[in-house]
Amino acid sequence: MDQNKLKQEAAQRAAEFVEDGMTIGLGTGSTVVYLVEAIAQRIKDEHLNLTGVATSVRTRKQAESLGIPMKALDEVGQIDLTIDGADEVDKHFQGIKGGGRSHLIEKIVAINSARNIWIVDETKLVDTLGKFPLPLEVIPFGSGKLLQRLADEGLKPAYRLNEDGSKALTDSKNYIIDLHLGKIEHPHLLAEWLNKQVGIVEHGLFLDLVKTVVVGTTHGPEILDAHRG
């Protein structure tokens, strides 16, 4: 089955977790595009009263264009549910996010949410994190020195570039440095070290935030729940 079809089916299944009256966080990425469409359709069909909080400019624009009422994070209380994609998810429900350059805002929204659900296709499930490059959102000033420090630690860093060779910018006008690690044996220790490095605004390790993952498979969407083991 086409990978986009798997994403679409998983997104449609995840949209079923949305309930009337909720404030919902809307993630960023190719899978979330289908999610926003599915939620907008539910609002139209079921007359749901929802408020959305977007994690990126492009998600907000899509949601508003489809009639989903949107507010900024500081304009709402706690978010009831945030649904987002992920670039990798391991068997312990830890993940890497940031392929879409939005992991800083995604993490801020996630930690302010009562519940987080990820939607992925089955290719994103891994035994060990790290094959997907780990993104770091970094302050532009002094980023070259930071890049060298990361290289000295053996973390194989590289600026993320646009097609024209310019440095890719986040919505917050920061740079992205990707770490090409191959395998992350101890994600919590790595996260702790990265948190101490001056110049790194946020890393793409999302640890201990999610208990439910909706997976698009060739046999239909499957729900993985950490509480069920």
Curated annotation (Swiss-Prot):
Family matches, as NCBIfam families: PRK00702.1, rpiA
Catalytic activities: aldehydo-D-ribose 5-phosphate = D-ribulose 5-phosphate
Keywords: Isomerase
PANTHER family: RIBOSE-5-PHOSPHATE ISOMERASE (PTHR11934:SF0)
Entry function: Catalyzes the reversible conversion of ribose-5-phosphate to ribulose 5-phosphate.
Pfam families: Rib_5-P_isom_A
Family: Belongs to the ribose 5-phosphate isomerase family.
Annotated GO CC locations: cytosol
Residues engaged in binding substrate: T28, G29, S30, T31, D84, G85, A86, D87, K97, G98, G99, G100, K124
Protein's name in the database: Ribose-5-phosphate isomerase A
CDD domains hit by this protein: RPI_A
GO BP: D-ribose metabolic process; pentose-phosphate shunt, non-oxidative branch
Keyword Cell cycle listed: no
Active site: E106 (proton acceptor)
Pathway field: Carbohydrate degradation; pentose phosphate pathway; D-ribose 5-phosphate from D-ribulose 5-phosphate (non-oxidative stage): step 1/1
HAMAP family (alphabetical): Rib_5P_isom_A
Entries under InterPro entries matching the protein: NagB/RpiA_transferase-like (IPR037171), Ribose5P_isomerase_typA_subgr (IPR020672), Ribose5P_isomerase_type_A (IPR004788)
GO molecular function per UniProt: ribose-5-phosphate isomerase activity
Assembly and interaction partners: Homodimer.
Documented EC number(s): 5.3.1.6
